[in-house]
Amino acid sequence: MRNFPEIQNTAYDLIVIGGGINGVGTARDGALRGLKTLLIEKDDFASGTSSWSTRLIHGGLRYLEYFEFNLVRESLREREVLLHTAPHLVQPLQLTIPVYDWSSRAYWEIQAGMILYDILSFDKTLPSHRMLSPQQFQQLFRAAEKKGLKGGAQYFDGQVEYAERLDLEVTLSAQKAGAAMLNYVAVKGLEKGENNLITAIHCQDQLSGEKFTVNSAQAIVINTTGPWVDEVCGLAHRGGEPVAIVQERKIGGTKGSHIVVDPFPGAPASALYVEAFVDKRPYFIIPWLGKYLIGTTDHRYDGSLDRVKASDDEIDYLIAETNRVMPAAQLTRQDVRFTYSGVRPLPYTDGKKAGSITRNHILYDHSQDGVNNLISLIGGKLTTYRQVGEEMVDKVYGKLRRSAPPCPTLTQPLPGAEAYPLSLETAMDKYGNHLERHSIQHLFCLYGARAGDILALVHGAPELGERIIPSLPDIKAQVVFAVQAEMAHTLVDICRRRTAIAMVTNDYGFSALAGICQTLTDHCGWTQEQCDKQIQKYHEYMEQNCIPDYCLH
């Protein structure tokens, strides 16, 4: 799998840097259309922006205000594609917008937006919107603030509770199609030749320290590193001397933070899309994995991209706004069980309000900068990753001066949605006496048809059917499967991205680590030294990214 000498000696057509959703989507599209493809990711797949979103597959209702109708239409079409190609991961989500007399958008404006949203999603399978009177809204959300209520609007979008697993399934699909997909490989340098090409990419394995070089003279190099786009462009050199690829900054990231809380008094049964009182920015209160996901914020960000964290002020803002619309909640800092924050890789614009910066993606061809085989993605959303991949690969074929085969991803299901001989009902009959039914259902939610592969592990080693910790349905076989079949190399990979253990245990997953390490020692060959080192790194990761600062003082 990590055969660096072979990779070093392979001539690739397409080399993708960055393993977020747009990178793996591009690699998948390229591999499925016959390109010899390599993807390099310095951390884990979906370890950046793709992992820190609000977990919505949505059209972007808010973008209508900025007349980005093409973006909304494209997003709504891609929402429909994902509902069909990844139905185990992407589910319909009902959202309700309360309208108050202090709202910046009047009831009729919301209604007009809803009508337009329905028109732009003319080919949808989800229900159309409905407007609610104040009385109807209060019947549905009895604990919501009543003062000044003008009514509401109810509509449907999509939710991907396990966004990291969407990225992973696209990765596995790309790998199955022949792409070499490498996590924990950092790009250390881009060699710019005299012929205006990136001729070599110097890499280092982050796990072993091994260095190797990929020949890129015949390839098109795609930079899908999100907020790191400018940083990667800054790695170019010629004959050991730095060479500037771009003269101007391309990415102007904005930071979005979320908090996770337990169900609270008056918690809504379905999602709310609320306008914040303080700054008029819309945010979400969403039921998520038995808890509530609340966010997001939107602030310009120029800090470290590798350590992004919700500030105490952002946490206080989300708590206060939730308490304002749900007065019975009375949330405090002590109710926050988990936080996460990410950076949106938006185009750099000077002086524009963060919320008004376009969410349209840009395929930036660096031939205008004197590099003919490098394209950077600026922007890009979780929802539209497939479209981005298709556009990128069309462009790659054009630059290679080859005719592009048809793109198959519009209808091709992701691995967990492919036909599999073992259905949920069959699994219940076959394993119901050996495994808790709740755990079997949970496996099918996470892995879809691939749940059968995990159940096969349990069949071979029954102890792997035991829960990792009593309060969660996750079983030990998932740990083994993550390492053996899903390229997990660290405890953070396992608890934060292959499962959601870190986010739903109320202690950042710390209580699960000892048991997970025992499973890794027994079944995956981990040493005690390796376990101890990983536990330490796990604690560091949580302190740097997820545990509020006020809890660390």
Curated annotation (Swiss-Prot):
It is an enzyme of class 1 (oxidoreductase). It catalyses: a quinone + sn-glycerol 3-phosphate = dihydroxyacetone phosphate + a quinol. GO terms for biological process: glycerol metabolic process; glycerol-3-phosphate catabolic process. It is found in: Cytoplasm. Keywords: Cytoplasm, FAD, Flavoprotein, Glycerol metabolism, Oxidoreductase. One of its GO terms (molecular function) is glycerol-3-phosphate dehydrogenase (quinone) activity. It comes from the Bacteria. The keyword ATP-binding does not apply. Belongs to the FAD-dependent glycerol-3-phosphate dehydrogenase family. This is Glycerol-3-phosphate dehydrogenase.
